Amino acid sequence: MQSKLFILLFVASMIFHVRLSAQQDTTVTLKSKASSKALMKDTLDGKFDFSSFLIDAKGFIPVPFIITEPAVGGFGLAVVPMFLTPKKRPPGYKGYIAPDITAGFAMYTVNKSWALGGMRIGSIPAKGLKYRIGGGIADLNLSFYRDVTDKGEKEFAFSVKTVPLLFSLSKKITKQDVYFGLQYFFAKNKLTPLFVDSLPSSIQSDELESNVASLGTFVDWDRRDNFFTADKGARINVLYSANDNWTGSDFTYQKLSAALNLFIPVKKTWISGFRVESNFAFGDPPFYALPSLVLRGVPAVRFQGYTTALVETEQRFDLSLRWSAVAFAGLGKALEQDESFGEAETAYNFGGGFRYLIARAFRIRTGIDIAKGPDSFGWYIVFGHNWNR
């Protein structure tokens, strides 16, 4: 759950981690033609477009968000003031260079969940370094699901007060955009039951007020042609982390996660995307830190286990320069410690939506998805790609 909490806290920072290409000529043309009265129109087709505003605002983006995550009530509002600082290209450097991003974040939802946070995402291209620093505070009302003897699956609602901190640093180790890095995550957590029944046997009372702190190593290979809405390419990320007394954690456990995102241009107007992801927990993690399935239409932490695995596909069909239709579907399983793959319940999702090319110069698409899961519907406002985490 700790990764999901960080997604909720810093969703804007993640989705704005755009990789700006070397198209300086396009940027300059847009800026020279845009007038103060036409900042929201594209110079190419005269349609509504955010590109000139982003350029003329010198990197400042005051972004409002509607939160649609079912786990925190299905509706809420967030404000994300953000600054983007373009990087200078070192001599001989090829490929994309992401801007430095400094962002704040404030949110409130209908189930009285709230969060405040901030994050800095930056790089030193000449040294082949990338870094992330983030922190926040949150009070989230979340439901967890556990099997109870003779009663089947039951919902247990908690107020989750958490103060998370994150730091990561990675170094480019090959010419093929492979980065190796270290990541430290700390969270001070206090969970208060919002139910009158006793705790299930799978939840221990000493887990309700505790610290988790992990030190991890990761490898990241990213050859997508654009972070926001890739038309081709792939990304592979593998992370191993350990929680122990020496890291500052009250628990001893380890996690291993691996993810692949692949984008194939079947046609110029048809982009086929595939996602494969698996997570493993070893040792004795607290119940809220167990891996969970992340699928549209499935509330956060709805399916947890010591092992999770999922596959998902998303097909994008470009109907015109601006408008696209998307369709997606996925399957996943969350396995308990002594549960076989065949015994675990299968979670699924399917749905569709639309995208609008809202910033052509940056290839940013935004839209709405409607998804069906095993026992719920969900709708999501998407900025960039849903898999950007």
Residue ranges and their predicted role:
Residues 53-62, 66-211, 363-365, 371-389:
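Gram-negative/organellar outer-membrane beta-barrel architecture
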Residues 60, 77-79, 114-118, 161-167, ...:
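Hydrophobic, lipid-facing positions within transmembrane beta-strands of outer-membrane proteins
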